[in-house]
């Protein structure tokens, strides 16, 4: 993982937010493939305190952050941020985007999301403003049909790990 200073020098920034509840190998594959797709980008991994579209998290924010910290240690061009966790509330994506745009002033800001999120993107807080401010990087989700999206995006294909956090929690009876 890099320091904040290395982010300051970056012209391309990507945000990958999520609950990471729990963290699994598909999350890590998405990070690796984003870095391959965008070779000059600095990637900020942004665990949510609470996803506004989901039930409260199974694992507390501190535990999820520590899991990510261990998993991302030594990964070049990756920074773990506790911005949303520190808010202690559900943070709309546009708020995080505005925060990181103000903080780092990147020329390009990418937002990494799952294809399943495209289905309800229009219901996100200030969705139109969000789409003006970011370029989407969309990863396919196994088990989800291909979604027709009229906007421009960078596809991430071949995430071979079909495991979802929801499936892991269900297998644990949670």
Curated annotation (Swiss-Prot):
GO terms for biological process: NAD biosynthetic process. GO terms for molecular function: ATP binding; nicotinate-nucleotide adenylyltransferase activity. Its EC number is 2.7.7.18. Pathway: Cofactor biosynthesis; NAD(+) biosynthesis; deamido-NAD(+) from nicotinate D-ribonucleotide: step 1/1. Transmembrane segments: none annotated. Keywords: ATP-binding, NAD, Nucleotide-binding, Nucleotidyltransferase, Pyridine nucleotide biosynthesis, Transferase. It is an enzyme of class 2 (transferase). It catalyses: nicotinate beta-D-ribonucleotide + ATP + H(+) = deamido-NAD(+) + diphosphate. InterPro entries: Cyt_trans-like, NadD/NMNAT, Rossmann-like_a/b/a_fold. SUPFAM superfamilies: Nucleotidylyl transferase. Catalyzes the reversible adenylation of nicotinate mononucleotide (NaMN) to nicotinic acid adenine dinucleotide (NaAD). Belongs to the NadD family. HAMAP family: NaMN_adenylyltr. PANTHER family: NICOTINATE-NUCLEOTIDE ADENYLYLTRANSFERASE-RELATED, PHOSPHOPANTETHEINE ADENYLYLTRANSFERASE. This is Probable nicotinate-nucleotide adenylyltransferase. It comes from Helicobacter pylori (strain J99 / ATCC 700824) (Campylobacter pylori J99). The lineage of its organism: Bacteria, Pseudomonadati, Campylobacterota, Epsilonproteobacteria, Campylobacterales.
């Amino acid at each position: 993982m890099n320091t904040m200073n290395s982010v300051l020098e970056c012209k391309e920034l990507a945000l990958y937010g999520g609950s990471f509840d729990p963290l699994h190998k598909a999350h890590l594959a998405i990070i690796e493939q984003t870095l391959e797709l965008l070779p000059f980008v600095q990637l900020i991994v942004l665990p949510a305190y609470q996803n506004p579209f989901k039930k409260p998290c199974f694992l507390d924010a501190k535990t999820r952050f520590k899991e990510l910290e261990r998993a991302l240690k030594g990964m070049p061009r990756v920074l773990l941020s506790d911005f949303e966790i520190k808010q202690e509330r559900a943070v709309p994506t546009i708020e995080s985007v505005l925060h990181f745009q103000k903080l780092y002033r990147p020329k390009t800001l990418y937002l990494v999301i799952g294809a399943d999120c495209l289905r309800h993107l229009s219901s996100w807080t200030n969705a139109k403003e969000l789409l003006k401010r970011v370029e989407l990087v969309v990863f396919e989700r196994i088990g989800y049909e291909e979604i027709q999206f009229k906007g421009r995006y960078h596809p991430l294909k071949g995430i071979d790990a079909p495991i979802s956090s929801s499936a892991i929690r269900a297998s644990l009876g949670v």
